[in-house]
Amino acid sequence: MTVKIRVSNTLSIAVLLLIASTSFAQTSSATNRAASRSWPAFWREFSAAIQKKNVAALTKMMPDDFFDGGGGLKAKEWLQFINENEKKGSWRDIQRSVARGTVASKKYSKDFPTRVTKDNAYYFEFRKDKRWYFAGVVGD
């Protein structure tokens, strides 16, 4: 009887560990490959939208949970703020940041592939729907 209980307990622990490891698993290699393949097209489209100050196109590239750096603005509100502050250089600053390019980053998210501008100002995430998003402003 004791052997059956030990075997049962061992199997239960193994199953729980397997479930836990898949629940907390990092990004899969297939996801990373898909992200790498789709990044250049997204980046070209995003960079063009930034250069043209195309708010409609940018809005489509931003998730509902866009992070504005801590001010609590939604994506459309943040873009409106950028437009309203154009004379203070808001668009110019974003354009310069984007012109420098991006690097892959694991600092901000282990759940999905992430890239950040080289000046560490803005970040991008490849979400579960297999699309890249301009996910937010890097907070202080």
What label would you give each PLM region?
Residues 20-22:
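N-terminal signal peptide c-region/cleavage motif recognized by signal peptidases
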Residues 51-52:
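Charged, alpha-helical scaffolding/interaction elements associated with membrane systems
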Residues 28-48, 59-140:
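C-terminal-biased regions
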Residues 12-18:
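Hydrophobic helical h-region of N-terminal Sec-dependent signal peptides
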Residues 2-12:
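Bacterial N-terminal signal peptides that target proteins for export
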